[in-house]
Every structure is written in structure tokens, then in C-alpha cells.
Amino acid sequence: RQMCIRDRTKRYLTFEKARFGEDRVLATFDVSEDVEDTLVPAFVIQPIVENAVRHGMGDDDALRIDVTVHQDGEDAILIAVADNGVGMDEGTAARLFDERSARPDASSPQGGGAGVAMHNISERIHRFYGPHSYTRVESAPGKGTKVLLHLDLSESIFDIQE
């Protein structure tokens, strides 16, 4: 199922705010008008926001999640999901896309290996938006995490406008 990015993310965050409290999960959206009606599959954005809440939230401070979506060239969009969470080191960020790290781990409390969601998202983006699309993670311990998705709409297998 496809839904515009802002609506999909707001809907998911409603559940997280109910779970942790309105004051613990804060979100901003900066979606340029020329892409605000662009549709993306639910299983691309939602797991990134879910990871921000699950892995980025500290013990005391509110987690801020900023979602920006802008045109990136003529036929592409750039989606950035940034948080002010606990962050991660370069090695951990690199392992997010390592197929060996993405294998399910029954002993994990979350039921998966490190990076299962990011590995799956990266594969979906290539499959659904073509070889010129990519996923990148920028993070540092104590500085939060930013996930960037570059989606080549000219290669999309979806009807991308409402």
C-alpha cells in the first residue's frame, strides 16, 4: 500500500507517542510542495522512523525526528530522516547494510540481526526505484542519526502521484 510520506509517518508516530508520551517523541516535517503528493510504499519510511524510536531514544530526553523531502534533480527525490538520538559509530553504521549482519537472530530481543530493516530497505529501494537510487546513513555517538534515501522516480515501478 502506498501513502504520501507525511501522512504515513504521522500515522506511525501517533502510535509511538501513545506508547512513550506526547512529550517524548517530537517530529517535524519539511516537505517541499513539488513532492508533497509523491507516494512511497509503507515499508520504506516506516521502518526508518521505527528504528529511530527503538534504537535512538535515550532514557530521559525527548527524541526529535525531522523528516525532510525535496526534489533532487529532475526525476528524483531525497528523503532525510534525522534524529537527535544516541547515534552510532562508523563501524555499526557500516554493518547496517552488511548482508551477514542482517540475518535473523532468534536470541535478539527485537527478533532480528543488526541492520535487518536497513538491509531490507536498501534492497527494496534498488528493486523498486532502480540502480541509481541509494540509501546512506550518517551518524556519530551522541550526535544522532540521519538516514538518506535518494529515489530515482524515473525508474520507479509505482504510480508515484496521487
Predicted segments with their positions:
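Two-component histidine kinase transmitter core
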Residues: 152-157
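Two-component histidine phosphotransfer core
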Residues: 2-138, 146-150
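Intrinsically disordered, low-complexity acidic/proline-/asparagine-rich linker or regulatory tail/stalk regions
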Residues: 160-162
